[in-house]
Amino acid sequence: MLARLAAKRLLEIRQVFRQPTSQVTRSLSTALNYHLDSPDNKPDLPWEFSEANQSKVKEILSYYPSNYKQSAVIPLLDLAQQQNGGWLPVSAMNAVAKVIEVAPIRVYEVATFYSMFNRAKVGKYHLLVCGTTPCMIRGSRDIESALLDHLGVKRGEVTKDGLFSVGEMECMGCCVNAPMITVADYSNGSEGYTYNYFEDVTPEKVVEIVEKLRKGEKPPHGTQNPKRIKCGPEGGNKTLLGEPKPPQFRDLDAC
């Protein structure tokens, strides 16, 4: 009897591990974790840092010892992504590998590990919804649904006009202001690139933010709750209302 139960359980486990990862666990990235050649993303396509960004490359490398160039892989990938309109083709990764003098696989490992690196095309305004527990409890799924429904896309897709795409990111570190989104603005490449947090958002507020971006406006980032100042409570402080008392010390002369 026990042997039959064990065999049945083993079969169930094997069936689970045969499924694609996306069916087993919630994916933390909207892209594949491997590369597929396409007409606009293959190793033999030329890619180089622009003349304007060459000086930025030198500046980034200057922060590290010459024998530790590989430490610059993340900021260089970020710069390449900004230049390329928000995504990293494999030829851009190869260019970074050449700059820091490592095998390309070392750069691929970093680019596929961090979900902030996009290996497929995104919109000029890439909207990322925080999906971690505090934001989820505060309604991040409703925020994401509002964005997807308003834009008429699925997660990871780009709107027909090329302006917007929506993805998910894990904890953005502003849990006290949940729920929140971030907007990566690639509309001007690496010149004028911004990455801003919009906190205390509602489904209506994120739609309003999208429409302001569509008009070329720059909506104010930070908390979207007018009753809050940064991460303070609504209506102002509830504690620490006066000057704090000084620390108490013993009279050492009395010892």
From Swiss-Prot:
UniProt-listed Enzyme Commission number(s): 7.1.1.2
Q: PROSITE patterns this protein is in? A: COMPLEX1_24K
CDD domains according to UniProt: TRX_Fd_NuoE (cd03064)
Q: Which reaction does it catalyse?
A: a ubiquinone + NADH + 5 H(+)(in) = a ubiquinol + NAD(+) + 4 H(+)(out)
What does the UniProt entry say about where the protein is found?
A: Mitochondrion inner membrane
Q: Cofactor comment in the record?
A: Binds 1 [2Fe-2S] cluster.
Leader sequence residues: none
Name one molecular function that GO assigns to this entry.
2 iron, 2 sulfur cluster binding
Q: Which domain of life is it from?
A: Eukaryota
Q: What Gene Ontology cellular component terms go with this record?
A: cytosol; mitochondrial inner membrane; mitochondrion
What subunit structure does UniProt give?
Complex I is composed of at least 49 different subunits. This is a component of the flavoprotein-sulfur (FP) fragment of the enzyme.
Query: Hey, which family's this protein in?
Result: Belongs to the complex I 24 kDa subunit family.
Q: Any idea what this protein is called?
A: NADH dehydrogenase [ubiquinone] flavoprotein 2, mitochondrial
Tell me the organism.
Arabidopsis thaliana
